[in-house]
Amino acid sequence: MSDRKLSTREDADVLLEEELKEPRRFRVLLHNDDYTSMDFVVAVLIDIFRKSREQAMSIMLSVHEKGIGVCGVYTAEVAETKVAMVHARARAEGFPLRCSMEEV
């Protein structure tokens, strides 16, 4: 917190409002491609996003049928980390799986 003195009630209200702001949230998305196996997508969803097998299957089918699927909603740092983890794992396994994030 800053060392400056609060001179009015308005200053206190502004500082309190700033302290209570919710962090920005981001959807993490998986994108369909013609090469990544469905089994690999399910494994990524279970291992990286901590989805149940049923949830992972549902998201994987959305990716397959609609071209995109939502893995979850996270703060910016968590979303960035999960995107990087997906890309690293996909590259290590030789898949071109794309993962992205968008602000909610």
From Swiss-Prot:
Pfam families from the UniProt entry: ClpS (PF02617)
- What superkingdom heads the lineage? Bacteria
> Which GO BP terms sit in this record?
protein catabolic process; proteolysis
Q: Which InterPro entries match?
A: ClpS (IPR022935), ClpS_core (IPR003769), Ribosomal_bL12_C/ClpS-like (IPR014719)
**Record's subunit section:** Binds to the N-terminal domain of the chaperone ClpA.
Membership in a protein family: Belongs to the ClpS family.
What is this protein's function? Involved in the modulation of the specificity of the ClpAP-mediated ATP-dependent protein degradation.
HAMAP family to which the protein is assigned, alphabetical:
ClpS (MF_00302)
**Name the record gives this protein:** ATP-dependent Clp protease adapter protein ClpS
Tell me which species this is from. Oleidesulfovibrio alaskensis (strain ATCC BAA-1058 / DSM 17464 / G20)
Organism lineage reads as: Bacteria, Pseudomonadati, Thermodesulfobacteriota, Desulfovibrionia, Desulfovibrionales
